[in-house]
Structures are given as C-alpha cells and as structure tokens.
Amino acid sequence: MLCACATPSQHFSDEAKTLGFASGNLDGEGFRHVVYFAQIDRAADALHVYVEHDGTPWIGVARVSDDPTPRTPFALELMARDHGPRLFLGRPCYFEGRRDSGCSARMWTQRRYAPEVVASMAAALQAFLAKHPYGNVVLIGYSGGGTLAWLLASRVPQTTAVVTIAANLDTQAWTTLHDYSPMNGSLDPVREPALPKSISHVAYVGDRDTNVPPTIVRSFAANHPEAKVIEIATFDHTCCWIERWPELLNAALASRSR
C-alpha cells in the first residue's frame, strides 16, 4: 500500500514500476532527466518517445507547487498500452529533479516550455539515441507534453512523426481563455516555423474538451496547415484517450503514408 506521505515524484515512480518500466537518468544541457523505458533492445526501427502533461505547477490560483510532478500519470498510461520500444522522457525539474542545480519554480510555471527546457530534453534524447540508434523517432505528448513534443520534433533529426493529444499548441490563446498568467519566456508552437516536411503531425483533440477546446488546436493549425487535426466525438481532456490509445496510435502512424 502506498504511504500517504509519499511525494508526487515517489508516487509517479511507484506507478512506473507497477506498470513494468525500467528507470534511469539522462543528462541534458544543464538538467537531469528521469526516464522510463521498455522493450528497448527489441529489434525494431522506430522508438516511441512519450512526454507527460504539465502536472501541478500551481496549487490553487496563487501558490506555486513544491513538486509539479503529475499526480495522475497519463502519458505513462498511454505508453503502457504501446508494445514496441518506448521511452518516457521526463522534463527538467520534475520527478525528483526540482532541487537540481538550475531549477526554480519558473521552470514549471512561466518557463515550462522555454528554449532551455526544449534544448535539454533534446540533448537527453540524443544521448539515449547515441546508445540505442533507432532510425525513426515518434514523439508523443499529452496536453502540455504535446506542446513540448512538437517543439522537440525539429530539434531531434531522427523524428519522423509527432502525435499530440489534447495539446495546448497555441499557448497564448490557451492562457487567455483560462485567464492564466502569460507564459513569459516559453516558446509557443503557433508562432514557431513549420516542421520539416519529413515530419508528420497528427493533432488529436476531443470535441468536449473544455481545458484545450478544439478552437485552440484549430488556431494552431491555421498557422500550421501541415498539421492533421482529428477531432474525436464525445472525448474530453481525459476521456477516453487511454482506453482507445492502441487504435488511435495505429491510425496516426498509418496516416503518414497517405
């Protein structure tokens, strides 16, 4: 039984172990990254890399969280329903890393999508790929993790596809919608250059999502028409992505050849 005093980071680690994932750490650029993985030595050409949601940057409207690590794993659960080689790539300052050198609350609030966050995650992933040279990388991110996955794509040469789920790809529109603090210092995908034509992007969104409504994703797609937006009826921000993930992942990957 999980101790009631366990931190979110400890809880997340315990959940990863329960799901059967091995764990490790990778050095990025100035930050340490917790990773979880499975089937890494299996013969396959593609590696699926998962990025988790923003977790709990704030407690209420004014208090910054001491530990932003997600209380409810979501991308981790998606990864558990995938069956090929797969890697969960942790963010800087999450998953017991919040006390590392270079970490401050800004790294999980205003600067959660900052250039140094993306650069460090890309460096950590490249360090992993140097030891496990997969020719194709598929980046998969849920909610704010989808935003980071998209930002990572052009910085990881092995990337062939990005799949985002309920991702706030127009962060300015998203913060305005919810009256959140501006993401000063963060990158905003809607204002970034298009991905290389060699990288496909499927952007899933639920038609009942009130956190990241379809208008946010379509606002992004208006500036990035190369993105294939797929709106799923009756889905919201959490239902029912995990249950339908194998089917949705297969559909997203199949769309690359169409």
What are these regions (language model features)?
Residues S9-I40:
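N-terminal cap/lid segment of alpha/beta-hydrolase-fold proteins
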Residues R32, Q39-G97:
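Short, surface-exposed "cap/lid" segments of acyl-processing enzymes
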Residues C103-K131:
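Alpha/beta-hydrolase active-site loop
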Residues Y134-P182:
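Primarily recognizes the serine-hydrolase "nucleophile elbow" in alpha/beta-hydrolase
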Residues A167-C239:
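The feature captures the conserved acid-bearing segment of alpha/beta-hydrolase catalytic domains
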Residues C240-L253:
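Post-His helix in hydrolase/transferase enzymes
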